[in-house]
Amino acid sequence: MIEEGGNKRKTMAEKRQLFIEMRAQNFDVIRLSTYRTACKLRFVQKRCNLHLVDIWNMIEAFRDNGLNTLDHSTEISVSRLETVISSIYYQLNKRLPSTHQISVEQSISLLLNFMVAAYDSEGRGKLTVFSVKAMLATMCGGKMLDKLRYIFSQMSDSNGLMMFGKLDQFLKEALKLPTAVFEGPSFGYTEHAVRTCFPQQKKIMLNMFLDTMMADPPPQCLVWLPLMHRLAHVENVFHPVECSYCHCESMMGFRYRCQQCHNYQLCQNCFWRGHASGAHSNQHQMKEHSSWKSPAKKLSHAISKSLGCVPSREPPHPVFPEQPEKPLDLAHLVPPRPLTNMNDTVVSHMSSGVPTPTKRLQYSQDMPNLLADEHALIASYVARLQHCTRVLDSPSRLDEEHRLIARYAARLAAEAGNMTRPPTDASFNFDANKQQRQLIAELENKNREILQEIQRLRLEHEQASQPTPEKAQQNPMLLAELRLLRQRKDELEQRMSALQESRRELMVQLEGLMKLLKAQATGSPHTSPTHGGGRPMPMPVRSTSAGSTPTHGPQDSLSGVGGDVQEAFAQGTRRNLRNDLLVAADSITNTMSSLVKELHSGAEAEEQAGTEKTREGLPPRGTFLSVFLLHTWTKLAGCQTHSTSRERSQAYGKWGGTA
């Protein structure tokens, strides 16, 4: 007893699962009943994965389960309904890729419980065929035009006229869907529902039915049906517009623009819940937008419309013939084949399709004639299909095609079973059949080997794509080491950039100093180089490309430096920083030696000038220049980070000896 009670509670929980999930979505806060109903049914459609099945797949499932041969009032059990639903989802999984497979068992359970709750409220355990077709055709995915055409085919007679009794029955079944999601007070069935759809028309054809159902606005009792399709179309539409109430930067889905307030726009969540701010009111007329157009596109469209360049709007649906097509004449195409003996007459069909009796000839002469007759029959069948412009329009046409194919297959089987071959060709046919069997066996073996190879490669690929535990343990260490190496590389690049920048600044200073020395040497040979004459020391100009990359050559770092320094340092682009600094040190040493000689030659004049400057409180110019030169040499010696102590001692010795 306890186990039975637990099973009953589990079954009830499964039946109520879809409704519990729907209540969790909080659709009841939507103010307008039309949007509330459409949102609920759209949720049921997506939760049951019916949006992945179009109307043509539904028709195929109906035929596979024999529902097309049953009368609309025939009742089927819940177990047979479960079989129909199972075939729908299993066929769906065959069409979907392996990465998008659905849970078939869960989808079957959700849809079955929803249909039973909607259409078997009395608990009889039976549903009519028309109820199943109406519900699945309404809730499946695909185009609304295709749905309405199929629904009209179920409600029309052989002359293509809609029967109002069938329409009333369809509305009764279709309006059970809003009632199932607790929207019965707004969209429940009434006896006057048919006349609200077609108030004056007496003869309703297909085009008139489509015009009424796809009009804007549609019939009031079915206004939620086209809205549910529009919801499916705009779920992923992006609007780069800010909502005037919640101030979100963009919108998804519908966008609503007030026709009275200037530039007042709401997202679908705010509009559905009745939010308003500022001077806007819920009583204002709102325009629904399902797409976004840029201002430039709107302007071009307005100009084209004013100039009459915009083409006329296409009709909402193509115009279909008023008269339904006639069924195929199966007896004319493939007449029944009687079972005959060797001496009986056979019927050969020419391309015209008229049967003519002939005597059976010998086997060698009869086979080509039979093949020619079969080819002519197939050609006439193809020509007949080409002239049929709407083969897939009516569901009855598929039944006739199935019967045609079945009869044609039975005819071929009867010919193959009743036709006896002459003994002269028995050995030849046996050898040919043996060779064909051998060829088939070889092809099957090759196919089996190819499948095994594909399976082996797939396993190898999966094993290679899945990391082993050892690799998983080594990966963090490798990543940490790689991160340290990158950090060290960045530090070295920054250090190299700083050295290059410092070197370039020193070269600019030396260039200015050498220009000053040359100017004083040409003007007054006995005068020491000073900063006199009101000429300021040129300051270094920072290049934007100095710190961008540390891999440029020496010539790049000497851009903007005078010719003397470039000649001293332009010893080849392949030298490294240490060699460039050593060459620079040699050049500076030579320059310093010539400078010191000039200083010694004019010592007396410098002492006298220094005495006068000291009296005036100013430092001697030669002393200032010497200090500046020593400071410059010290900075250059410090830039030689990679030079050896021997090279440094040689450089200092050269400087000291020269001094």
UniProtKB/Swiss-Prot annotation:
Comp. bias (Polar residues): 521-530, 542-558
Organism field: Mus musculus
Residue numbers of Phosphoserine PTMs: S394
Phylogenetic classification of the source organism: Eukaryota, Metazoa, Chordata, Craniata, Vertebrata
PROSITE patterns (UniProt xref): ZF_ZZ_1, ZF_ZZ_2
Residue(s) carrying N-acetylmethionine: M1
Gene Ontology CC: basal plasma membrane; cytoplasm; dendrite; GABA-ergic synapse; inhibitory synapse; nucleus; postsynapse; postsynaptic density
Tissues and organs where the protein is expressed, per its UniProt entry: Expressed mainly in liver and lung. Expressed in brain, namely in neurons of the cortex and hippocampus and in the dendrites, soma, and nuclei of pyramidal neurons of the hippocampus region CA1. Expressed in kidney, namely in epithelial cells of renal tubules, collecting ducts, Bowman's capsules and glomeruli. Expressed in blood vessels and pia.
Name of the coding gene: Dtnb
Effect caused by changing T11A: Does not affect interaction with Kif5A
GO MF, one annotated term: DNA binding
UniProt KW keywords: Acetylation, Cell membrane, Cell projection, Coiled coil, Cytoplasm, Membrane, Metal-binding, Nucleus, Phosphoprotein, Synapse, Zinc, Zinc-finger
Protein name, as recorded: Dystrobrevin beta
Binding-site residues for Zn(2+) 2, renumbered to this chain: C258, C261, H280, H284
Subcellular location: Cytoplasm; Postsynaptic density; Cell projection, Dendrite; Basal cell membrane
Zinc finger (ZZ-type): 238-294
Region (Syntrophin-binding region): 369-418
Transmembrane segments: none
Pfam families linked to this entry: EF-hand_2 (PF09068), EF-hand_3 (PF09069), ZZ (PF00569)
Sequence similarity: Belongs to the dystrophin family. Dystrobrevin subfamily.
Annotated function: Scaffolding protein that assembles DMD and SNTA1 molecules to the basal membrane of kidney cells and liver sinusoids. May function as a repressor of the SYN1 promoter through the binding of repressor element-1 (RE-1), in turn regulates SYN1 expression and may be involved in cell proliferation regulation during the early phase of neural differentiation. May be required for proper maturation and function of a subset of inhibitory synapses.
Coiled coil regions, renumbered to chain: 429-519
Record's subunit section: Interacts with dystrophin short form DP71 and syntrophins SNTG1 and SNTG2. Binds DTNBP1. Forms a specific complex composed of DMD, SNTB2 and SNTA1 in neuron; the interaction with SNTB2 and SNTA1 is DMD independent. Interacts with UTRN and dystrophin short form DP71 in the kidney and liver. Interacts with SNTB1, SNTB2 and SNTA1 in kidney and liver. Interacts with KIF5A. Interacts with HMG20A and HMG20B. Interacts with OLFM1. Interacts with PRKAR2B and PRKAR1A.
Renumbered residue ranges of the record's region Disordered: 520-562, 599-620
PTM comment: Phosphorylated by PKA. Phosphorylation at Thr-11 alters the interaction with KIF5A.
Source species, domain of life: Eukaryota
Modified residues (Phosphothreonine): T11, T69, T179, T212, T424
